[in-house]
A protein has these predicted regions:
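Enzymes that bind and transform nitrogen-containing heteroaromatic metabolites
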Residues: 1-142
Length: 142
């Protein structure tokens, strides 16, 4: 199962104007599993090709995590972003392993993933680094 913030699902803000928007990915999103979208605005689940069903969660990160764990069974729950969503789960101590892919590209100001978060203080340490041609993959474990 996956958990995404609303911005990762789409560009629409506020109330859903209609049911036309079904995500950035077309009819067959890359998740192929139950995917829980954090939002303040309720919406009926959307079943897509390939096994993805988007569920819209309005009662917080804990509720989304509980539903994702129930849906995943013995499999992992993956937090797919964006930055605000990952930050909330880091601060809640709900992420056991964080896989970062750092690319040498200047994208602008953006949002800071780790601003004012004491990763060592939360128990995280670097357990793996893998340099590749296009990125360095860093695994943090708690």
């Amino acid at each position: 199962a996956f958990i995404l913030g609303r911005n990762m699902f789409g560009p629409i803000r506020g109330e859903w104007p209609d049911d036309a928007w079904k995500g950035w990915w077309g009819d067959n999103p890359p998740y192929h599993a139950p995917t829980f979208i954090l939002t303040h605005h309720a919406r009926a689940p959307i079943m897509m090709e390939g096994g993805t069903t988007f569920h819209f969660i309005t009662n917080g990160i804990e509720a989304a995590l509980a539903q994702a764990k129930a849906a995943a069974g013995d499999l992992d729950v993956k937090i797919g972003g964006g930055v605000l969503t990952v930050r909330q789960y880091l601060l809640a101590g709900a992420i056991d392993e964080l896989h970062l892919a750092q690319s040498p590209v200047v994208l602008g100001r953006g949002e800071s993933l780790f601003a004012d978060i004491d990763l060592p203080g939360l128990g995280y340490r670097v357990t793996e680094t893998v340099p590749t041609e296009l990125a360095t993959h860093i695994v943090l474990t708690r």
